[in-house]
Amino acid sequence: MATKKTIEKATTKPVKAATKTTATKATKATKEPKTVPVEKIQEIADQAAQAQTPAAPAPGQVQVNVDFLKTTKVHIAMPCYGGMLTESTFMSFIKWANTARQLGIDWTLETMVNESLISRARNTLTAKFLDMPDATHLFFVDADIGWEPWHLLVLLNRDVDVIGGLYPMKTMPIKWVVNGFEGAEEGPDGLQEVSKAGTGFLLMKKHVFEKLKSHPAVKQYKNDIGLDPKFDQHLKTYFDTAVRQNRYYSEDWTFCENWRDIGGKIWMDKRVLLRHSGSYVFCMENQEHLMKTVGPMFLQEQQEKFGIKFTDKDGNEIKKITAA
């Protein structure tokens, strides 16, 4: 799925004779990097999916360095249990493919179906990525995450070792799949250091895994699932569950802890707000819970921020939301 780059042949033009002076010596001009505003990227993406609503408005005054992006090759890895993915994720890839083609950005995609053990799925996908000599970044995205092309492009443009975007847990009120910590470093334009980030939308440079080999928790394991033997050398427990501080950690939390153990940093771009699709059971009990927890906060926020008044079907103002 990699894009083909067009190479233009250099042409030689005749140069008119000119009087030589010391003041008119030829100098090599410094080439300015090509940049594209994220609004333009969103416009390109929407050409492929007019009906899809963006996950979040594209931030103004933000440029991505396309010349830099062309020096990268991101390998997108998606665990896809049962071969299923959501409509939101499908539309995201349609947009991404169209945008990457028009910008001339190289990328590849690997999915894994019917692997019920998510930690082994991630380690297998990582092993295949590490066997690709020209791939520079591994990008994990889950099959239930909705995203925009500019989300991935701004993460690549950050040029840090490990960085993710914000996606909600499948709960209301919204809680984000991320953990902060006291004294965390802050960078420009919404860049924030965190202690843990979910692998549902996480970008990692290749050398991260080379460095993680030194961590005692990262161990080689046997290829007993029928993979090509060429991947054997890369089969390591980069993503595994663990018990730390008397807590049971998922494979993404453990990855983050191991990386920070050896001096690495986990970053989050707070501009990258994503969609997390899931099912919901519609019943009276859930309605009561939702109205009690979310309803009052939503009503108060909308009234305070925007002066919005909510009315019932008879036109009477609703000043308080209660469960039916």
Give residue ranges: language-model regions.
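Short, Asp-centered acidic motifs that coordinate Mg2+ and/or phosphate
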Residues: 137, 161-162, 266
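Conserved donor sugar-nucleotide recognition element shared by glycan-biosynthetic enzymes
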Residues: 118-122, 252
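Short beta-strand-to-loop acidic/aromatic patch adjacent to the donor-nucleotide binding site
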Residues: 135-146
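Active-site nucleotide-sugar/metal-binding loop of Leloir-type enzymes
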Residues: 124-137
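Intrinsically disordered, polybasic Lys/Arg-rich low-complexity tracts
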Residues: 1-39
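N-proximal low-complexity "stem/linker" segments adjacent to membrane-targeting elements
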Residues: 38-116
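C-terminal catalytic/acceptor-binding lobe
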Residues: 69-71, 218-324
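Conserved catalytic core of nucleotide-sugar-dependent glycosyltransferases
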Residues: 148-240
